[in-house]
Amino acid sequence: MLKLICLRNFNTFSILGVVDSLNNGKNINKIISKKDMTLKEIVLYLPKFELEDDVDLKDALIHMGCNDLFKSGELVGISDTKTLRIGNIRQKSVIKVDEYGTEAASVTESCTTDGIKKIPIVKANVPFMFLVADVQTKIPLFLGIFQG
């Protein structure tokens, strides 16, 4: 199961404050694990959006030291062909968020006996960072910024 997490900087108008706070994997893991977070019921107005990206990964892999993947004869064990190599490698990512595809857009109603519960309203009408994470492994799968 996947979950969508939206992060917004309430202290400034810049999304860079959120990006700066996620400068290491520990902070992302805390967010995914719900550590140091309070569960609160809200009414969320989240814009529908669809983002698509197509990235050439060859330069990134070479920069990380994986240059042998792109040389002939370096993929022995995968095929009998001695000249097998990776010519190019690309990653295409698409994320679509709408009222049908995200739990974050739903509102849970609850009844209380001690009066009317005031539920905060949050309108995501400013830039925000989002991540999609696997609930079981707590691994972020997609990370992006919505700028409207």
Curated annotation (Swiss-Prot):
Name of the protein: Uncharacterized serpin-like protein FPV251
Residue ranges that the Swiss-Prot or TrEMBL entry lists as coiled coil: none
A GO term, aspect molecular function: serine-type endopeptidase inhibitor activity
Gene3D superfamilies: Alpha-1-antitrypsin, domain 1 (2.30.39.10), Antithrombin, subunit I, domain 2 (3.30.497.10)
Family to which the UniProt record says this protein belongs: Belongs to the serpin family. Poxviruses subfamily.
Organism of this sequence: Fowlpox virus (strain NVSL)
GO terms for cellular component: extracellular space
Record keywords: Protease inhibitor, Serine protease inhibitor
Lineage, uppermost ranks: Viruses, Varidnaviria, Bamfordvirae, Nucleocytoviricota, Pokkesviricetes
InterPro entries named among the record's database cross-references: Serpin_dom (IPR023796), Serpin_fam (IPR000215), Serpin_sf (IPR036186), Serpin_sf_1 (IPR042178), Serpin_sf_2 (IPR042185)
